[in-house]
């Protein structure tokens, strides 16, 4: 998802 999404924040 988007890097701005809390769910994907760790995947930035």
Swiss-Prot record:
Hemolymph. GO terms for cellular component: extracellular region. It is found in: Secreted, Extracellular space. GO terms for biological process: oxygen transport. The keyword Transmembrane does not apply. Keywords: Copper, Oxygen transport, Secreted, Transport. The keyword Chaperone does not apply. GO terms for molecular function: oxygen carrier activity. This is Hemocyanin subunit 1. Belongs to the tyrosinase family. Hemocyanin subfamily. Hemocyanins are copper-containing oxygen carriers occurring freely dissolved in the hemolymph of many mollusks and arthropods.
